[in-house]
Amino acid sequence: LKCKKLIPLFSKTCPEGKNLCYKMTMRLAPKVPVKRGCIDVCPKSSFLVKYECCDTDRCN
């Protein structure tokens, strides 16, 4: 699985066990990603932060 890094032109091959791509954004600025990469379990979104996870690089 390859996921995009914070700089969209670059991607990263995920290590074994981390089989989800994720994108973290602030709710106040939803179009600006704060963090991107590979993750094993999708964190819960909170009042300030929104997480978007999927098993392809389409969401991040």
Swiss-Prot record:
One biological process term in Gene Ontology: killing of cells of another organism
Location in or out of the cell: Secreted; Target cell membrane
Keywords: Cardiotoxin, Cytolysis, Disulfide bond, Membrane, Secreted, Target cell membrane, Target membrane, Toxin
Keyword Cytoplasm: no
SUPFAM superfamilies: Snake toxin-like (SSF57302)
UniProt key word Transmembrane helix: no
Main location: secreted
One Gene Ontology cellular component annotation held by this UniProt entry: other organism cell membrane
Subunit structure: Monomer in solution; Homodimer and oligomer in the presence of negatively charged lipids forming a pore with a size ranging between 20 and 30 Angstroms.
GO molecular function annotation: toxin activity
Descriptive protein name: Cytotoxin 5
Stored InterPro entries: Cytotoxin_Cobra, Snake_3FTx, Snake_toxin-like_sf, Snake_toxin_con_site, Toxin_cobra-type
Top-level taxon of the source organism: Eukaryota
Native species: Naja mossambica (Mozambique spitting cobra)
Family statement: Belongs to the three-finger toxin family. Short-chain subfamily. Type IA cytotoxin sub-subfamily.
Annotated TM spans: none
Purpose: Shows cytolytic activity on many different cells by forming pore in lipid membranes. In vivo, increases heart rate or kills the animal by cardiac arrest. In addition, it binds to heparin with high affinity, interacts with Kv channel-interacting protein 1 (KCNIP1) in a calcium-independent manner, and binds to integrin alpha-V/beta-3 (ITGAV/ITGB3) with moderate affinity.
SS bond list: C3-C21, C14-C38, C42-C53, C54-C59
Reported tissue expression: Expressed by the venom gland.
